[in-house]
C-alpha cells in the first residue's frame, strides 16, 4: 500500500506558544563576560603579587638610589655653568630639599668636609655647604662646587592604585 506524502507531513500537536523566557543577545553575554573577566584580572593583580613586586624601578647604571630618586655626582669641583649643563636628561641639579637630606647623611661619614654642592636654584646660581647645610645664592656662589645630578622616580598611577588598595585591605 503506497503512502501518500500528506500522511507523513509535520503536524503540530497544539497551537503555537511563544517561548517562556526571553534570551539575552550574544553581545550582552560578551559584554558581561568582559566586565567580569576584567574585574577578576584586576583583583588577581592586586591580591596575588607581594608588595615588593610593586616597588620602584631600579636606577640606571652609574646612578645610586636616594629616597624616591636617583643621584650621580662628579667628584671634581666645577663652575655653575658647567655643572648645569653636565646632567643628562631627565636629570637636573639636585633640588635643595633632597640636597639637605643628602648632606645630613654625608655629614655622618665626613664631618670635616667643607665642600659645596650646586643645587637646583630655578635658574639662579645656588649651592649648599655640606658641613652645615647652609645654602647661598648668586653673590655667595663664586667658587667652584660639586655637581650632583638627580632625577625623581615615582610609581605610576596603577601602582599607586594597587598599593592604596592593598593598604585599605590591610594586606602586607
Swiss-Prot record:
Intravirion face of the membrane: 1-27
GO annotations of cellular component type: membrane; viral envelope; virion membrane
Principal location listed in the UniProt entry: virion
InterPro entries cross-referenced by the UniProt entry: Herpes_UL45
Compartmental location: Virion membrane
Parts of the chain that traverse the membrane: 28-48
Membrane topology: Single-pass type II membrane protein
Record keywords: Membrane, Signal-anchor, Transmembrane, Transmembrane helix, Viral envelope protein, Virion
Virion surface topology ranges: 49-172
Function: Important virulence factor of HSV neurotropism. Seems to be required for glycoprotein B-induced fusion. Dispensable for growth in vitro.
Family: Belongs to the herpesviridae HHV-1 UL45 family.
Protein name according to UniProt: Envelope protein UL45
Organism: Human herpesvirus 1 (strain KOS)
Amino acid at each position: 500500500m503506497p503512502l501518500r506524502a500528506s500522511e507523513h507531513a509535520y503536524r503540530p500537536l497544539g497551537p503555537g506558544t511563544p517561548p517562556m523566557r526571553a534570551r539575552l543577545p550574544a553581545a550582552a553575554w560578551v559584554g558581561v563576560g568582559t566586565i567580569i573577566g576584567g574585574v577578576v584580572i584586576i583583583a588577581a593583580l592586586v591580591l596575588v603579587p607581594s608588595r615588593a613586586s610593586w616597588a620602584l624601578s631600579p636606577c640606571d647604571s652609574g646612578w645610586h638610589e636616594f629616597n624616591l630618586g636617583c643621584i650621580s655626582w662628579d667628584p671634581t669641583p666645577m663652575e655653575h655653568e658647567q655643572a648645569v649643563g653636565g646632567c643628562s636628561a631627565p636629570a637636573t641639579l639636585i633640588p635643595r630639599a633632597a640636597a639637605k637630606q643628602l648632606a645630613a647623611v654625608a655629614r655622618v661619614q665626613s664631618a670635616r668636609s667643607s665642600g659645596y654642592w650646586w643645587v637646583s636654584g630655578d635658574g639662579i646660581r645656588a649651592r649648599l655647604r655640606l658641613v652645615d647645610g647652609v645654602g647661598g645664592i648668586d653673590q655667595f656662589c663664586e667658587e667652584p662646587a660639586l655637581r650632583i645630578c638627580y632625577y625623581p622616580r615615582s610609581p605610576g598611577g596603577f601602582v599607586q592604585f594597587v598599593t592604596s588598595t592593598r593598604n585599605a585591605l590591610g594586606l602586607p
